[in-house]
A protein has these predicted regions:
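Active-site-proximal, substrate-binding regions of enzyme catalytic domains
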Residues: 1-29, 36-131
Length: 131
């Protein structure tokens, strides 16, 4: 169902179980989703877990955040490839949560075309994508 959150809860349970496997260190498990609602539900399910039962820390990435992370880690990727990855599955502007050079607070709806977003990602101090 579109209105329920069963899928997100199941993902959270699976991620929680995986985070307890031997050899799993913080940041080894990454959930990639562009659904801000799903990410929020997964995050809150993990945070609701008692501290002693949490397991390894999980990373939640959106597609634009993955592209920014790849660029920052100097993974060989062209500008056209970045635009192609970011624009997959969407039409129109890309909406991200983040900060730009002179922001004091997190802006939850930075909206721009994928080409402009890639330009900001490549620009020093252009944008810090949170999700």
């Amino acid at each position: 169902e579109h209105a329920d959150n069963l899928g997100e809860e199941l993902i959270a349970i699976c991620v929680h179980i995986l985070s307890h496997l031997p050899g799993i260190v913080d940041g080894k498990i990454c959930v990639l989703t562009d659904d801000k609602g799903a990410a929020s539900k997964i995050d809150s399910a993990v945070k609701r877990t008692n501290v002693q039962n949490r397991g390894a820390k999980i990373i939640l990435f959106s597609t634009p955040k993955v592209v920014q992370h790849m660029f920052q880690e100097q993974i060989e990727i062209s500008e056209n490839e970045m635009v192609n990855i970011i624009s997959q599955g969407t039409s129109g502007n890309i909406v991200v949560m983040g900060t730009t050079a002179y922001d004091f607070d997190i802006n939850v709806s930075i909206s721009m075309p994928s080409e402009a977003l890639v330009g900001k990602i490549m620009e020093p101090n252009g944008i810090n994508i949170i999700f």
